Swiss-Prot record:
UniProt record, GO biological process: aerobic respiration
Coiled-coil intervals, chain numbering: none
Protein name: NADH-quinone oxidoreductase subunit H
Family: Belongs to the complex I subunit 1 family.
Annotated TM spans: 17-37, 85-105, 116-136, 154-174, 190-210, 247-267, 274-294, 309-329
HAMAP family on file: NDH1_NuoH
Recorded topology in the membrane: Multi-pass membrane protein
Catalytic function, reaction form: a quinone + NADH + 5 H(+)(in) = a quinol + NAD(+) + 4 H(+)(out)
Amino acid sequence: MMNTLLQQAPSWGTTLWFIIAAVLLLAVVLGFVTYAIYFERKVIGWMQLRIGPNRVGPLGLLQTVADVAKLLLKEDIRPQHADKALFTLAPILAYAPAFAVLAVMPFTDSIRFADLGIGLLYYIALSGITVLGVITAGWASNNKYSLIGGLRSAAQMISYEVPLVMSVVGIVLLTGSMNLKDIVEAQRDVWNIVPQFIGFAVFIIAAQAELNRTPFDLPEAESELVGGYHVEYSGFRFAMFMLAEYVYMFGMGALITILFFGGWLPIHPSLDFIPGIVWFILKFSVYVFLQFWIRATMPRLRVDQLMSFAWKVLLPVALFNILLTAVVVSYQNGMF
């Protein structure tokens, strides 16, 4: 349907449909963010032999709603010597790209918004813009802790963006396309996690660093930097940074599901009667649970360990995966 609308001449009707689609997508993402935070606190609580949130609403289901309402009602404080324009712009720079990447995600064969031939490249290009919001927030706050957090984020994003991109080159070699729908369709016989297990391992580690999640959460390390790049933010601006983090996690989970877990395809052809969106949600939920598990169990790395691991371990492994995949593809095509 969206492709049909994209091919039509601009009109008030098509504009209205695009607005409705954007609002629906935003509602789904906000619903995910609301209850991802709740389940993260609940799961980590269980792992640490605690109960977790259980006060607001039945089983604590409205705890996140109460927290969001509290943030929105708090005073919006801006440091006296902060750069006003950039201080205001930073949360938008952090959030907008994280939401925009969802436009190319094919959740099923029919539920997708834009079928780009270079959907994978689009995602990689836009996701790199998020770091600009973090760096801008760190510099514009006129705070040493914020600045150090922003600089750490820049170094981390540059270091881990390289192996992240290289880890998906093997998939592009196997499928011959950067269209996310074509990548899913190419996994009908076997999911990419099997022939591209090395690439998957590199991707999921680099993705963890890109999300600034444990054990790579150095840009906002509470024990070292008070709160990192958003230490001077409060109210709805602070909420936008938190929202950007979980929206980005939503996008990364969707991308991993598409690239390595077969997207909406069933685990066996005999289970094809189950709707594709159900399979997508199940696979996506496995990744989200893995995020919670890692946060509950792993310690934070030092800065030198973080950088060394990216350049001395992940990058060589990603290059080896590209070489190995190229040899296999060449052999299959009869070049040897």
